[in-house]
Each structure stands twice: as C-alpha cells, then as structure tokens.
Design a protein with these regions (language model features):
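N-terminal secretory signal peptides
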Residues: 1-25, 49
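C-terminal segment of N-terminal export signals and the immediately downstream linker at the start
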Residues: 14-20, 41-82, 91-95, 103-106
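Conserved redox-cofactor binding core of oxidoreductases
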Residues: 18, 169, 174-291, 295-299, ...
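N-terminal export leaders
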Residues: 22-39, 327
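Glycine-rich loop(s) and the adjacent beta-strand/alpha-helix scaffold that form part
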Residues: 87, 91, 95, 102-107, ...
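N-terminal FAD cofactor-binding segment of flavoenzymes
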Residues: 101-146
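FAD cofactor-binding and catalytic pocket of flavoenzymes
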Residues: 179, 360-469, 505-513, 521, ...
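A glycine-rich dinucleotide-binding beta-alpha-beta segment and adjacent secondary-structure elements
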Residues: 258, 290-291, 400-402, 475-550
Length: 575
C-alpha cells in the first residue's frame, strides 16, 4: 500500500470521494474537540499544542529510511512505538526511524474500521489486523486473538477502555526489586499522557496528548446502566472514576479514550500532523520486520522481510507481545533448545515467549427485550470491578463483569442481544509464544493455557456466578428475555460451570509478559527495569511483553505510561 492510498480504491467514484471526505470531516471535528480541550485545560499554564486538524502534513520520508543510521530505530508503531517516536523526536538533534508492518494514515484520515469506537478488531480486516489464532485447549476451535497492524497498533482496534493499573500492581513490580516502578513514581507519566477533564487534579493530567473521557450514567446504554444499578443493589460501591485508586472497587461507567465516537489511537494522539512534520522523524510503514542482526552481543541493524536493512545506534523493539517475541526468536534470542530445533544460530539464551500471561474472558449472552433495539451504543461502557473471595485482600481486584453490545442480534429471538463479559484479572496460568517456522510472514504459535491453574478456575467460577446474579437482579432482570449462552443446561454447580468455562474461554486481548522485566538474577527476566535486554548491547524492549506481572485491568493506558516513562529515561541518559 503506497503512502497516499487511503482505502485501496484504484479508481474512486464521486461517491467514494464523498464518503472519504465525510470520514475526514468527522475525524477532524472530533480531533478539534480533543485539541480544544487540551488548549482550554492548558490555559492556566500557557502551554498548549497546535491542533493537528490544522497542521500541514508532509509525505513520509521513505527514502531516508534505508541506508542511513538513526540515533533511535523503533520497530513497531503501536501503543508504545508511536509514543516513543513522538517523545524521542522532540530532541531535534536526534534522528528517529519508526518502522511499522501495517499502513500509516494521516491522523485525520483513518478508515472507519479503525476510528469507529463501535467497531472492535477492525472487523477482522487483514489490512489492519494480524489475524492471529491461539491453539485451543479444551475449546472446540482455535481462539481468535486480534492484534492491530497499523500506525497506532492495537490501540486502533481495541475497546478503548482507559483504566490504569492499581497501586497494588506496582507493589508487585517493586517487590521484585525493580526500582522506579512504584505507583508514586509512575503517576507523573499517567498524568503526562492524558487530557482528563474530571476527577482529582492530583491524580489526573489536564493537557496531555491522549484524551480520556469519563462516561456518565446518562451516556451509557440501558443495559449497561441497568447492570451498574443491579451491582449497586447487590452492595457494590458506586464508582465515578475507576482511575482513582482510593475509590475504584465497585461499579460504574468507564473512562474511555473516545471523542465523539472516534477511538483515539496513539497514531492520532501522539503522531499528529505537527509531529510528523519534524525533519528528524522518519516513518517507514508497510515494512514487515524479519529479525535483528548482531555483531557479537551488540545489535547492528534490523532486517526487513524484503531483504532491506535499517540501522540504529539504539534499537527499540515495540512490536507487541507476539511480534516482539517472534522477532527476538528469529534473531537468535530465546530458549536455546527451541532455537536449535529451528536451526537458528544462538545469540542469547533467554526465556523469551515462555511466560505468556493474558486475561481470560468468557461471554455470557442474553436475548434482550425488543424495545431496546437501537439503544446499543456505546458498545462498551461500564463494568463492575471487584475482588473474589479468593483475593489476597480487598485491594486485589481480580474479577470484573462488563456488559457489551457486540453480538450479532440474529442470535436472539427478539432481535436484540447483549453480553456480560466475564473477566479474570488476576492470572496464574501461563502460556507460550513460539515460532512455527523462520518465515516472518507466518504467524507465531500461541498457547494461552487459560484457566489451567486451579486458582484461576476458582476465581472465574465465582465471576460466572456474579454475572448470573446480576442478570437475576433488578433492574437488569427486567431487560432480559432469556440466557442464550451457555443457557439453562449449565446449572450452578462448580463442575458444570467449570466445564462450560473450559470449553468457552477466550481472550480479553491483553497478552503480556513474554519478555519480562526483572533483575539480572531473575531466571524469568529478559530485560531490566529500563527495558534494556540483559546481556545484549544497544537493544531495548518497550511494550506489554516486558510487564513482569499482568496488571489487574486493561493494558493499553499502562503501555502508554510505560513508553512515556522509558522515553523520558532514554532522553535523560542522552542529556
């Protein structure tokens, strides 16, 4: 796909052009709102960024990418990579090359599959989504595990729920001896990244590039509102801000990175037109990365699938938990025995891909009353986030239930359907990511092993019972005609619920921990606390793969925070 193509239309008709212009105007209006909010919020300090809606756009500097050595070579332009490219290129003396396997769009011209908050996983469009499947465990078929393939990465295809990790999560990290990762030390980067117009000033940012909008009870759907009210009736607390660590155990509307129905991804928020105009920033899109080339223990270059090479004094892998893992393995960084089986020369024996973590997920589907037809947006908008009886304390929020409107209504006899999504947040079961072959065009082999740990299953059984209890509690009860899946054939015994969960468990699309952060003495660690790969020179990893534990909530805002923090650290080292 060439840089100036927008919809892969060879000979656009007048209708095509009108659709494209309507899309552009819609995104532009939304981003003007986003930028105006940041300007208003920054007024007190006199600091405001130029609106990307009016900034000029330049052609991507492809020719500069090949043959030149950049100060920073960033491999992967997703939730972390786009942030790194924007922040590291703020230093005009440093050159930055961002390489992305998928397409690059003008920040105001993303296609509907990517900008619409009512579309998840880009409708499985292979132009923008990798199409990965994990091997089944007890499920009857492989598990679809979508990942974004575009500037913005999975932040362009996800549910846009913008919840931060808990202080409890960061205590688990610092308990491993990793310095700089306490809640108090990461809070400035959460604030730096966001524009958030509600909540307490001491915990929220007001003029960052990433807009987060706190939904209200008046905005969410009748089903979502009813589930929240049923949760309150059962005694769960009223939550007005899930990102407030003093008051987030309970039920309420979600914070979302959505403006006027536009899911704002990092390619929009961080790589604005103004940022892309920087003379020291080059973006190479539609460029599949094969592997890294080393001289001794120092990384020299990255080899693309078409045989070209790109060079950087510092190389940063930000290709996501699957992509980063596969690139490392093809490069000879991984378990020695696995590499030998693939005839890949060993560069570094490391536990890459051996400790995959992911939030297990299960759909409980319902037929809803027919008068709710047309009242199904936003498709995601609320949750009850709490602790099970198996949690170590009330601070360990290990389960959640979230109502959504993503089902095909044809499955319901009323023509209206919704789901209660069961989410396991505290995870012990580990999986793997391995190579199927040395071909970079071939998907890695993903094995989740969801609910294989007995504690995970116990927590998920309790989450299942909570969802059913909510469905049987007013006012949600009155909106339900019947439970479609798993249905009345699955009773309330542990055995029946466990069997249903094992057969139907899927992914919340939060893979992480395949190249874990840890001390050099930690046998499971691949990188140190700054993302530097142990035993190798010039190579960092900055994406969800380096989380040493899976946060008890969505990953995307936490990956963005991580990228902000490590970018700041890199710039500090260079100063």
């Amino acid at each position: 796909m060439s840089d100036n193509q927008e919809l892969h239309v060879d000979n656009p008709s007048a209708a095509d052009i009108n659709v494209r212009e309507d899309r552009r105007d819609f995104i532009k209006r939304s981003m003007v709102v986003m930028a105006a909010g940041a300007v208003a919020a920054a007024g007190a300090t006199g600091q405001a960024s130029a609106s990307p809606a009016v900034a000029p756009v330049s052609r991507l500097k492809r020719k500069e990418a090949i043959g030149n050595t950049f100060d920073y070579l960033i491999l992967g332009g997703g939730s972390a990579g786009a942030v790194l490219a924007a922040r590291l290129s703020e230093d005009g003396k440093k050159s930055v090359l961002l390489v992305e396997a998928g397409p690059s769009f003008d920040p105001e011209q993303y296609p509907e599959e990517l900008y619409s908050s009512n579309i998840i996983a880009a409708n499985a469009d292979p132009r923008y989504e990798w199409g990965y499947y994990a091997l089944p465990d007890k499920q009857e078929q492989p598990v679809y595990t979508p990942r974004g393939k575009v500037i913005g990465g999975s932040s362009a295809i996800n549910g846009a729920v913008a919840c931060r990790a808990l202080p409890y999560d960061f205590e688990r990290i610092t308990a491993k001896g990793l310095k700089g990762w306490s809640y108090e030390e990461v809070l400035p980067y959460f604030r730096k990244m966001e524009t958030y117009h509600t909540g307490r000033d001491e915990i929220h940012g007001r003029n960052g590039p990433f807009p987060i909008h706190q939904l209200t009870m008046d905005y969410i759907t009748p089903v979502q509102k009813a589930m929240v009210e049923s949760s309150w009736k059962l005694g769960y607390a009223k939550v007005s801000d899930f990102n407030d660590p003093t008051a987030n155990n309970g039920a309420g509307p979600n914070p979302m990175n959505i403006v006027n129905g536009v899911r704002v991804n990092t390619g929009m928020a961080y790589l604005s037109r103004e940022v892309r105009e920087r003379s020291n920033l080059t973006i190479l899109s539609d460029a599949l990365i094969d592997k890294l080339r080393f001289q001794g223990n120092r990384v020299q270059a990255a080899l693309l699938a078409d045989g070209r090479e790109v060079f950087g004094k510092q190389v940063i892998l930000s290709a996501g938990s699957y992509g980063t893992t596969a690139i490392l393995l093809r490069s000879g960084v991984g378990p020695k025995a696995d590499l030998a089986a693939m005839n890949i020369p060993l560069v570094k024996d490391a536990p890459v891909g051996t400790q995959l973590l992911d939030h297990a997920f299960y759909w409980m589907n319902f037929a809803a009353r027919p008068e709710l037809k047309g009242k199904e947006h936003p498709v995601v908008g609320a949750q009850v986030w709490t602790h099970s009886s198996f949690a170590s304390s009330a601070r360990e929020l290990d389960i959640a239930v979230s109502p959504s409107h993503l089902l095909d209504p044809a499955i319901s006899k009323t023509g209206v359907a919704f789901s209660l999504g069961l989410e396991l947040m505290k995870v012990k079961s580990t999986g793997t990511v391995k190579l199927k072959s040395r071909d970079p065009k071939e998907a890695p082999v993903i094995q989740f092993n969801h609910l294989s740990d007995k504690d995970d299953m116990r927590r998920m059984v309790e989450c299942f019972r909570l969802a059913r209890k909510l469905a049987r509690t007013e006012p949600l009860k009155s909106l339900i005609v019947e439970e479609i899946y798993p249905g009345p054939s699955v009773g309330d015994s542990d055995a029946q619920i466990s069997e249903a969960l094992a057969k139907g468990v899927g992914t919340l699309q939060h893979p992480c921990a395949t190249a874990r952060m840890g001390l050099a003495s930690d046998p499971l660690a691949v990188v140190d606390g700054e993302g530097r790969v142990h035993g190798l020179q010039g190579l960092r990893i900055v994406d969800a793969s380096i989380f040493p534990e899976i946060p008890l909530i969505n990953l995307n805002p936490n990956v963005i925070m991580m990228a902000e923090k490590i970018a700041d650290r890199i710039r500090g080292e260079e100063a």
